[in-house]
Amino acid sequence: MAVLRQFVKNSYSSIPKRFYALSANQKKLLKAPLAECDPTVYKILESEKSRQKESIALIASENFTSRAVMDALGSIMQNKYSEGYPGARYYGGNEFIDQAERLCQTRALEAFHLDGEKWGVNVQPHSGSPANLQAYQAVMKPHDRLMGLDLPHGGHLSHGFSTPQKAISAVSTYFSTMPYNVNKETGIIDYDSLEKAAIQFRPKVIVAGASAYARLVDYKRMRKITEMCNAYLLCDMAHISGLVAAGVIPSPFEYADIVTTTTHKSLRGPRGAMIFYRKGTRSHDKRGNPILYELEDKINFSVFPGHQGGPHNHTITALAVALGQAKTPEFYQYQKDVLSNAKAMANAFITRGYKLVSGGTDTHLVLVDLTDKGVDGARVERILELVNISANKNTVPGDKSALIPRGLRLGTPACTTRGFDEKDFERVVELIDEVVSLTKKINEAALKEGKSKFRDFKAYVGDGSKFSEIAKLKKEVITWAGKFDFPV
């Protein structure tokens, strides 16, 4: 035995140290900062940081999250695998991962003022569209029926969308989908026609929610409609969840069975999603016996193992931070400012003779109809981009093309985070008005050269350097936007 021990000792002593300890280069690879380790990627990040700081961000689904959220998002929680749910994982070593996820769930219920006896929440969905699919699949079988707001009328792809030729959204391949619409004259959801269609179509789920609808949804009316056809009411509050948490607009939770949301828009968290579900009694049978909700297990199973493997623990931890911030007085004031800024922006457009879909806004966004201005949203979006204003083209009721729509969607959450007030948004509208006029002028010049298609227009404009007006506006925006606070 002594001979064997000596043999083993001699064998280990002969192994070069680098076989069981990190070399200097290996340590450097693991510990070097990004700027040193990968200057190419670092340069891209720094360029994007400058772009964000020197731009006016008006995309309604974007925001600037806090330093604390960013710290959690880039933390060691990234390193851990944790398939399953707290207390029931398929991997060991999840004590603190469980703590973070449970904290996130608790804060989610608190942020939206929910009773844990009546509501539960899954915080593992990776993003909004998968969360919607996971919720649908929990309560629907393939080819069951679903209704959502039509995409050209302000809906979202994840609520189902088809053309006469084919299904565009995968949701419309899994399920039979029928859209409901807004009234083209008022821009408000046509609840009467929705009710008639729902009674005939008999959907299993009706989605209340939108990505480009500036008015409040009548959840009470939609609940009444779902009860007529024994459907679930699913509210997708992705855009407005921050406003709902702050209580500055009505909450869908009083009427909905299921509520989904992303976490990075008005909620100002990381890029993730949540699914809230009711618990307890859903209805009563003819004898008065309670019929219970059975959503918790179905939704949890649909998320994992149905559609996902391991959750993104760094995102869940960062979301817990954001939800904690959502309960503060400062967050409440922020959401009030988001609303007042949106109304100021809407009024400024109306004063300048612009047509707004629905005539104004009750939320964080404004949908501008450019039809009367003789130019489309795609061309205006491009010139705005060249002067460091980020917005997005958007369909308005009656549009036939999502690529060259007549609308422009504008939101206030991101710039409000940076400290823009009502007067600042009036100036923003002034800048946009200048861009609309400039775009029309440039497009007319392009048409004279036979460049009628949008791709021809983009080629004609190029990087904008040949147009002095673009250079002037860009310089003005960079100087002005750069003065505002930037959270990271």
Swiss-Prot record:
Read off the InterPro entries from this record.
PyrdxlP-dep_Trfase, PyrdxlP-dep_Trfase_major, PyrdxlP-dep_Trfase_small, Ser_HO-MeTrfase, Ser_HO-MeTrfase-like, Ser_HO-MeTrfase_PLP_BS, SHMT-like_dom
Question: Which residues, renumbered to this chain, carry the PTM N6-(pyridoxal phosphate)lysine?
Answer: K265
For this protein, the Enzyme Commission number is 2.1.2.1
What UniProt keywords apply to this chain's record, in alphabetical order? Mitochondrion, One-carbon metabolism, Pyridoxal phosphate, Transferase, Transit peptide
One of the record's GO molecular function terms: glycine hydroxymethyltransferase activity
User: One GO term of the cellular component aspect?
Assistant: cytoplasm
Task: List the Gene3D superfamilies hit by this protein, alphabetically.
Answer: Aspartate Aminotransferase, domain 1, Type I PLP-dependent aspartate aminotransferase-like (Major domain)
User: Subcellular location, in the record's words?
Assistant: Mitochondrion
Q: Give the pathway listed in the UniProt entry for this protein.
A: One-carbon metabolism; tetrahydrofolate interconversion
Transit peptide endpoints, chain numbering: 1-20
- Presence of keyword Calcium: no
Q: Which reaction does it catalyse?
A: (6R)-5,10-methylene-5,6,7,8-tetrahydrofolate + glycine + H2O = (6S)-5,6,7,8-tetrahydrofolate + L-serine
Pfam families per record = SHMT
**Which PROSITE patterns does this one have?**
SHMT (PS00096)
Q: What class of enzyme is it?
A: transferase
One GO term (biological process): tetrahydrofolate interconversion
So which cofactors does this thing need? Answer: pyridoxal 5'-phosphate
Keyword field contains Acyltransferase: no
Q: How does it assemble?
A: Homotetramer.
User: Which protein family is named in the record?
Assistant: Belongs to the SHMT family.
Report the protein's function: Interconversion of serine and glycine.
What name is this protein filed under? Serine hydroxymethyltransferase, mitochondrial
Q: What species is this protein from?
A: Schizosaccharomyces pombe (strain 972 / ATCC 24843)
